[in-house]
Curated annotation (Swiss-Prot):
Its main location: cytoplasm. GO terms for molecular function: glutamate-1-semialdehyde 2,1-aminomutase activity; pyridoxal phosphate binding; transaminase activity. Its cofactor is pyridoxal 5'-phosphate. NCBIfam families: hemL, PRK00062.1. GO terms for biological process: protoporphyrinogen IX biosynthetic process. Pathway: Porphyrin-containing compound metabolism; protoporphyrin-IX biosynthesis; 5-aminolevulinate from L-glutamyl-tRNA(Glu): step 2/2. The keyword Isomerase applies. One of its GO terms (cellular component) is cytoplasm. This is Glutamate-1-semialdehyde 2,1-aminomutase. Keywords: Cytoplasm, Isomerase, Porphyrin biosynthesis, Pyridoxal phosphate. It catalyses: (S)-4-amino-5-oxopentanoate = 5-aminolevulinate. HAMAP family: HemL_aminotrans_3. Belongs to the class-III pyridoxal-phosphate-dependent aminotransferase family. HemL subfamily. It comes from Alkaliphilus oremlandii (strain OhILAs).
């Protein structure tokens, strides 16, 4: 790892912590981060020339696999005409039409540049539309790094938000209320304690940032009901689940309709992009036709739109892609359950193995995981050519480029690693 170590040393001189996103630093697992040089299909290659079966996929958007030829061709064709115009383009209209066709609840959509920006804008819109200020989020659900979402539960769901990062003011955090995922009573209590004050409830329909945690049967439906009864908007953060669980995302998969939905990198095949959309009457509150301001120079840029149109078209016209990734997800999940007593949560092509034998249904049960054991497993697998998330509380992503052989190699490597760990 000499070259990666040299690059990390150089990076630390000019980039805080040597990385541009904290998880890349390997702080949770130890060792030197791998600097990636290239990727193709289900594999990534580091600067030393080592190849790994990749289960990160740029944290989700590489659902077709790395360096998909159709996406690369679409981007190449567009970029020779110009990278950004700061003006409207035909491609952004086509992209919006495609999203609204695939997701029936999204009657209008606004393009932005990241999932964080989509969430930030959707929350502002919800507050502007309802003329209320408070928002309910769930402990363990991650919605990007905008100030109002960087809060934790404190002493539980009964208190106002407490800043979870230096630089976030109490004033910003106080209007963010925190409930417990899969605990509908905690949501109901917050509505009772804040009557006519809650603008929206935002959640990941499948939590994927405390590891993969599925909603209990009826949980999403009950949250939907509480929002409707109390005049609050329901916002699904589908940065992870959108166009992955199904062409219509979690709304299609679970049969629960949100008022607003946010998307991130997956709608651009890995290009920097995001979007938020929903009912027409809500979306028409956005400037330039409404009082809620939101703007972006690079929003709807042609490269991201070309990549997104190509990828979403591939997904919508080829249902066998979902059949393939879901079958492999089942194969990996079932295989893990056979070789370990650790808890394995999975849905479709999203999987997490928690280093605990206890059921994981929320952030508290997820935190019971032995992160030291996960760190050991991660490094064993890395040495065997398997690249999983460098943190316990993240998901594994399967792409259409993964094969049965990849899954079998991965299961064999995990079984070998667990056996090696037991001997030490």
């Amino acid at each position: 790892m000499k070259k990666s170590q040299e690059l990390m040393t150089r990076a630390k001189r000019v980039i805080p912590g040597g990385v541009n996103s904290p998880v890349r630093a390997f702080n949770a697992v130890g060792g030197c981060p791998r600097f990636i040089k290239s990727a193709s299909g289900a594999y990534i290659q580091d600067v030393e020339g080592n190849s790994y079966i990749d289960y990160i996929g740029s944290w989700g958007p590489m659902i077709l696999g790395h360096s998909n030829p159709k996406i690369l061709q679409a981007v190449s064709k567009v970029m020779i005409k110009g990278l950004s115009f700061g003006a409207a383009t035909e491609l952004e209209v086509e992209m919006a039409e495609l999203i609204t066709r695939l997701v029936p609840s999204v009657e209008m959509v606004r393009m932005v540049n990241s999932g964080t920006e989509a969430v930030m804008s959707a929350l502002r819109l919800a507050r502007g539309y309802t003329k209320r200020e408070k928002v309910i989020k769930f402990a363990g659900c991650y919605h990007g790094h905008s100030d109002s979402m960087l809060v934790k539960a404190g002493s539980g769901a009964l208190v106002n938000g407490v800043p979870d990062s230096a630089g976030v003011t109490i004033g910003v955090a106080k209007d963010t209320l925190v409930a417990e995922y899969n605990d509908i009573d905690s949501v109901n209590l917050l509505f009772e304690q804040n009557k006519n004050e809650i603008a929206a409830v935002i959640l990941e329909p499948v939590a994927a940032n405390m590891g993969v945690v599925l909603p209990k049967d009826g949980f999403l439906e009950k949250v939907r009901q509480l929002c409707s009864q109390n005049g609050a908007l329901l916002i699904f953060d589908e940065v992870i689940t959108g166009f992955r669980l199904a062409a219509g995302g979690a709304q299609e998969y679970f049969g629960v309709t949100a008022d607003l939905v946010t998307y991130g990198k997956i709608i651009g095949g890995g290009m920097p992009v995001g979007a938020y959309g929903g009912r027409r009457e809500i979306m028409e509150c956005i400037s330039p036709i409404g009082p809620v301001y939101q703007a972006g120079t690079l929003s709807g840029n042609p490269l991201a739109m070309a990549a997104g149109i190509t990828m979403l078209t591939e997904l919508s016209e080829n249902p066998q892609i979902y059949e393939h990734i879901n079958r492999l997800g089942t194969k990996l999940g079932d295989g893990l359950r056979k070789i370990t007593s650790n808890t394995v949560n999975s849905v479709g092509s999203l999987i997490s193995m928690f280093m605990t034998e206890n059921e994981v249904i929320d952030i508290r049960s997820a935190m019971a995981s032995d992160t030291g054991e996960y760190s050991r497993l991660f490094n064993h697998l890395l040495n065997k050519g398997i690249y999983i998330a460098p943190a316990q509380f993240e998901a594994m992503f399967i792409s259409n480029a993964h094969t049965d052989e990849d899954i079998e190699k991965t299961l064999s490597a995990i079984e070998e690693s667990l056996n090696e760990m037991r001997k030490k």
